[in-house]
């Protein structure tokens, strides 16, 4: 099935890309979630518009991403968590928890999808978490987990 992406899809492409996927993946996931539209000749103009808008936004967002990265590098956010007797967390710290903590600490608003946790945070202490700000720009934020009182 030939589709045009309207939203970024991990390991597939960015808006405006023409992709060939299996019928089931297209019909059951990409189309219902509005991540893609069916490819037609008339959609070629739409592809060009999406690509042009993406390039204009990319130039602006690259500069913004550099500024956000410099803000995040100096930021230490605290996440309050429930802890057991042995110092281990009940559950784990999620990307949503980190995004909320960054916002509360006066940092920039981050999407939880942009936060990359390599291994689950299940202990008390300081942890470094990656943040994908742009295709070529990644930042880091320090997350300190503290036990709830």
From Swiss-Prot:
Disulfide bonds: none annotated. GO terms for cellular component: ribonucleoprotein complex; ribosome. The keyword Zinc does not apply. One of its GO terms (biological process) is translation. GO terms for molecular function: rRNA binding; structural constituent of ribosome. It holds the Pfam family Ribosomal_L9_C. Keywords: Ribonucleoprotein, Ribosomal protein, RNA-binding, rRNA-binding. InterPro entries: Ribosomal_bL9, Ribosomal_bL9/RNase_H1_N, Ribosomal_bL9_bac/chp, Ribosomal_bL9_C, Ribosomal_bL9_C_sf, Ribosomal_bL9_N, Ribosomal_bL9_N_sf. Coiled coil: none annotated. Transmembrane segments: none annotated. Belongs to the bacterial ribosomal protein bL9 family. PANTHER family: 50S RIBOSOMAL PROTEIN L9. Binds to the 23S rRNA. NCBIfam families: L9 (TIGR00158). This is Large ribosomal subunit protein bL9. It comes from Cutibacterium acnes (strain DSM 16379 / KPA171202) (Propionibacterium acnes).
